[in-house]
Amino acid sequence: MSLTLIQLVSEQTLQNLLPALALRPGQIIQVKSSDPRFKQTPRHFVDACKVAGLDATDFPLADTIPHDSPDIQETMQCLEAIIARHDKADLALNLTGGTKLMSIGAYRVAAAHGIPSLYTDTQNRREFVDAQTGRWAPFLPCLAEQVQKLTVPMVMAAQGKDFLEDSFTEPLLEFGREAWRLRLDYHEAISAWTGAIRNSLPRRNMRIDDRPAILRQFLQTPLPSTASAAAADYLDAAAQAGLLRVEPDGRAYLAAEPKKSSVERVSNLLDGAWLELAVADMARRGGRFADLHWSVEPEQRGDDYGETDLIAVDRQKLNLAVISCKTSTEHVSTLEHLSSWRDRARTLGGSHASGHLCLFRAKSPAQASDLCAMGKKMNIQVHIAEDIPACFAEPCSGAL
């Protein structure tokens, strides 16, 4: 018997993707309202399933209920028409998506025909909930196993997002770990040295010069030296990661190509983006965040989001985690950043995605308190200083 899964379309993409991964049906029939927000959602869901390897599953055109917000009766009429076209013994219903009225209508139809149905409870991280409308044969799979299969490309494909990214290397992650350790106690001394490097970069019109000859000359010029032992240790860690080249005489040079993007990348990693590597290293050693992606940007120009520091699957919240890393708030409007990050999270992972701000240093305890309060109102989790490893490096207490 080949299972046909009927599901309701809404913004809740994971609640539909997880049952598809679990049941691997021969066919998935999507039922959506006429709400224009969901016009492309069925196509994006198909793309996500293809990314997940459901190549043997058929996806007929979605059935559309001719109303932006269907009531119970309209939903029941649509589902009755679908059931009439199929052998009821092959059908199952996912009640999770759609509006509450659509879910009620779907439940009533499933109960009337004895069709098995389920609800995906991602909020409380339970197993798939058997709605007791029919008998599952043989039984519902384990939700925990499906969560382990989730990847960032799957979740973003369900939102219609393709992306490019940078690549982690073990030396870079080790640099992030060492940078965190050193900067906890010697941030000012190290920042003075990396700031001197930043100020030594060749510039034109306030930006890094993009002329290869100028950049080549800069890369052959020794970087500013430092008398700080901590900064010297930081230099050694950066050299081990391939960010600096140190000659036998002790002079250090930026290890980059004579291209603006390459020089900018290395200098940023030394001065501020080291925090992205530190958080990534913590997340890889912890148990909560899976399938970490770094420096994510749209594959297509003109897409509706910019570069994103880190993206991962949050196994505790069962959603996409969109993570911003800032060493300070010196050049950032905190309210504007939190607001834009909330929008970024929703753009990339849907209405249930969560935003995170990792801040290495706040200006004062009062600012830290204000930031956390603002973040709570905007559904952005703010982690400051030692709160960062508490979230990212610890085992996942609520993981399935």
Segments (PLM) and residue ranges:
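N-terminal beta-strand-loop-alpha-helix module at the start
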Residues: 1-44
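Hydrophobic beta-strand segments of well-ordered beta-sheets in folded domains
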Residues: 2-7, 23-31, 56-58, 91-92, ...
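Structural motif
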Residues: 7-11, 31-35, 95-97, 297, ...
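A broadly used, surface-exposed interaction patch
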Residues: 27-95, 106
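Short Gly/Thr/Asp-enriched flexible loops that form oxyanion-binding sites at enzyme active sites
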Residues: 100-114, 371
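Beta-rich, aromatic/charged-enriched effector core domains that present basic-aromatic interfaces
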Residues: 124-164
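Intrinsically disordered, low-complexity Ser/Thr/Pro/Gly-rich regulatory segments
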Residues: 152-400
